[in-house]
Amino acid sequence: PVAPKKVQVALIALLAGIMLPALWIYIRSLLNTSVHTKKELKAGVNIPFLGEVPLEKNKHEKDIVVQEGSRESICEAFKIVRDNLDFMDTEKKTVGKVVLVTSANPDSGKTFITLNLGMSMALANVKVVILDLDLRKGSLSKSVGIGMKKTGVSNYLSGKVDDVKELVQVCGDDNRLHIITSGALPPNPAELLKSGRLD
């Protein structure tokens, strides 16, 4: 029988202890597709970068944090996005603009961004109507305390309501920001959105 060489075993264990975690970290970095910086975002997509909103862990996701006269960094971030949207519009339409806030995943901050960007625009004396097109959950309507009003987008798209002005409600405490709720949740949301009445 041959006794194990303790120095050789210790060196192999040390190398394995260094190499295996390093290999694991390298593989995870290759498989990680998330974006962490503005530079990574600009390199990954060919669209204009409007701004970034800091993560506010102590704020409730559905709170409107943009307030008149506030100098908080999150309020300033929304004002920068608002101003950049305005600068992108070189034609300066007088009719109106549409801004779509969307994402591939639920709970990614769409409601928070929509409400605060809308409030930022309203504070700049822009008439704002937020349209809740989530015909499956109506989360935007719920978050501002309006709830599921009997008349909303689904009622208009199904032809039960003809005058859009009947659907507009004041959003929260500020009368400059308005919302059209999703309305009663329909059994066929995809078909309603394709109905052509949204054009």
Report residues per predicted region:
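Polar/charged helix-initiation
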Residues: 1-2
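Short boundary/hinge segments that flank catalytic cores
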Residues: 11-129, 133-154, 158, 162-166, ...
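Active-site-proximal beta-strand/loop segments in catalytic clefts of secreted hydrolases
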Residues: 183
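Conserved acidic segment of CheY-like receiver
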Residues: 180
